[in-house]
């Protein structure tokens, strides 16, 4: 394979803005006052917030295709790459568990799933798959997983219910979490990063690998943009059609959800590539590049600093609520005040990210 892409600045920017968006929606000034687009869907449906996690898995897939194609072209031993993949996956997973233990380090209530553990699993499976299969095989595997998940979820009755259920808390994926998931679960009896839903989440990474293969092809830049947009459009359209029988749902990562969000990610990558790498647009993209240079570190920093802003009590009230009350005292509507705080929090996280970027400190797990 010819590697015509040396460095996709557009991918760095997309990664950074995705992380910034993740921090923005995770840390509002007041969780009771949040604009609907900045909230996850309660169950079925899709909000802009629902797109963030699959975007990051998609970006992981693109990065795998670019990074490991270069290493294969250099003739590096696969055995060495396997070791590094396993070690990196373990590190990302371990950091995720560490964040789950904060602030009390209560091992009896440990949560074994979450954003970083899922990223670790998707990275591990996708990277090993990429080193040992061609893109067509990867596409077939991804499609097979989605079809199998669809059939399992829509044909196998939930034990104890006597019929197929796709509702919250009583579907097969949630039942499996309740029966077999160790430790604490995010929703008490089930987890949005649960056991069964992890399989289709791997396909979000596979879709990114396929996009990465496209970016590495000998096609012209213009043709790459066209293909990204066309593929993305048809994936999104097909996903919503699939959603008529298997609803678009982030909580159980339905097959239709994978298609819709992967399609949007294809189009987003095409837009970023056109604007940044083709047209050289730098205005407004630099913050994304800075965030993207240390994406996981920035994510971890957001969680750790939250202990201060959400945990430290001054006068019986947390710092975030002091900011929220100050903004509302200025006449802001509660939801606007909550969003302004979230933007301010992203800006605070940006400061150490900028310092690391300027000093060329890039922390790679």
Report the location of each language-model feature.
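Alpha-helical transmembrane segments and their immediate juxtamembrane cytosolic regions
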Residues: 1-365
């Amino acid at each position: 394979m010819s590697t015509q892409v040396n460095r996709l600045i557009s991918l760095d920017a997309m990664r950074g803005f995705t992380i910034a968006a993740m921090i923005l929606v995770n840390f509002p000034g007041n969780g009771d006052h949040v604009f609907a687009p900045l909230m996850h869907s309660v169950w079925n449906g899709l909000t802009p917030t629902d797109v963030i996690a699959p975007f990051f898995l998609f970006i992981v897939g693109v990065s795998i295709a670019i990074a490991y194609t270069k290493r294969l072209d250099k003739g590096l031993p696969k055995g060495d790459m396997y070791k590094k993949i396993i070690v990196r996956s373990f590190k990302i997973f371990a950091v995720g568990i560490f964040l789950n233990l904060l602030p009390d380090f209560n091992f009896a209530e440990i949560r074994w799933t979450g954003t970083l553990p899922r990223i670790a699993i998707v990275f591990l499976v996708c990277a090993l798959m990429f080193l040992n299969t061609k893109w067509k095989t990867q596409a077939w595997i991804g499609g097979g997983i989605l079809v199998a998940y669809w059939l399992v979820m829509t044909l196998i009755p939930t034990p104890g219910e006597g019929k197929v259920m796709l509702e919250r808390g009583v579907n097969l994926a949630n039942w499996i979490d309740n029966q077999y998931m160790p430790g604490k679960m995010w929703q008490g009896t089930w987890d949005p990063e649960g056991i069964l839903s992890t399989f289709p989440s791997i396909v979000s990474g596979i879709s990114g690998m396929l996009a990465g293969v496209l970016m590495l092809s000998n096609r012209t830049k213009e043709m790459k943009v066209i293909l990204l947009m066309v593929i993305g459009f048809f994936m999104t359209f097909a996903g919503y059609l699939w959603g008529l029988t298997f609803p678009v749902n982030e909580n159980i990562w339905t097959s239709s959800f994978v298609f819709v969000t992967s399609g949007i990610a294809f189009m987003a990558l095409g837009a970023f590539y056109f604007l940044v790498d083709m047209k050289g647009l730098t205005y407004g993209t630099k913050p994304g590049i800075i965030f993207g240079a240390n994406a996981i570190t920035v994510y971890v920093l957001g969680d750790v600093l939250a202990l201060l802003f959400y945990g430290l009590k001054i006068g019986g009230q947390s710092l975030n609520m002091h900011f929220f009350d100050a903004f509302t005292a200025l006449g802001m509507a509660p939801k606007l005040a909550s969003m302004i705080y979230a933007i301010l929090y992203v800006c605070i996280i940006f400061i150490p990210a900028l310092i690391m970027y300027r000093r060329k400190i890039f922390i790679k797990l």
